């Protein structure tokens, strides 16, 4: 990724390291913008806080022989749709989460609030969202699609990730049942666009989400055709 630079008052271009010092003198909106730019640069280089938190969590789970699968935006990135995120979504069984907490709470991870599934990495200051096998995406109500067992995970970029089929299925079920999760439908469209997912994937999906996948796929195809 190209080095992100900041134009100084004198018209010269400052590298990001120097830009960090310059932003200390900017007003709050400008400072927030450049802090976000530095965060994005670190993220897309794979050296940011979120990547470090993910790798630290995954290596700990593997050392403890606790099955897991990275989900959410970090899984999207692993499959080829690059977008920034500020947290790590991880799939665990209920027993796996209990085992991890018993060994590691207070040792680099804390609960977000007493008894919460979610945690926070205290070394990287990154939120960890935990998805539990058997729970339901979207509105949380029983439905044909549920969070799978981590055993479905595949190895990708040094960590275990949800396969494309499961990731797409969960995001479609989430977006279809929770109006506050429309971005999950957008994620599916962007993944189709980024890696050219085939229409034939529809046959591997749960019947609950097949129509929506086909609808999004055809809309994305029409959009691409209109550009030429």
Regions picked out by a protein language model, each given a short descriptive name:
Residues 2-228:
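Compositionally biased terminal segments of proteins
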């Amino acid at each position: 990724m190209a080095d992100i630079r900041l134009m100084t008052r004198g018209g010269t271009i400052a590298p990001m390291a120097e830009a960090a010092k310059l932003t200390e003198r900017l007003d709050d909106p400008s400072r927030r913008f450049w802090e976000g730019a530095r965060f994005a640069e670190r993220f897309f280089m794979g050296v940011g806080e979120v990547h470090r938190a993910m790798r630290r969590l995954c290596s700990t789970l593997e050392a403890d022989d606790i099955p897991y699968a990275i989900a959410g935006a970090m899984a999207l990135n692993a499959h080829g749709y690059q977008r920034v995120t500020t947290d790590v979504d991880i799939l665990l069984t209920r027993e796996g989460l209990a085992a991890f907490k018993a060994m590691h709470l207070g040792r680099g991870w804390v609960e977000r609030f007493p008894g919460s599934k979610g945690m926070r990495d205290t070394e990287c200051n990154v939120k960890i969202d935990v998805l539990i096998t058997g729970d339901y995406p979207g509105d949380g109500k029983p439905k044909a699609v549920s969070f799978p067992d981590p055993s479905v995970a595949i190895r990708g970029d040094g960590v275990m990730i949800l396969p494309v089929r499961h990731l797409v299925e969960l995001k479609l079920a989430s977006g279809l049942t929770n109006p506050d999760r429309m971005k999950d439908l957008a994620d599916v469209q962007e993944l189709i666009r980024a890696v050219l997912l085939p229409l034939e994937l529809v046959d591997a999906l749960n019947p609950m989400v097949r129509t929506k996948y086909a609808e999004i796929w055809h809309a994305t195809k029409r959009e691409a055709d209109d550009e030429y």
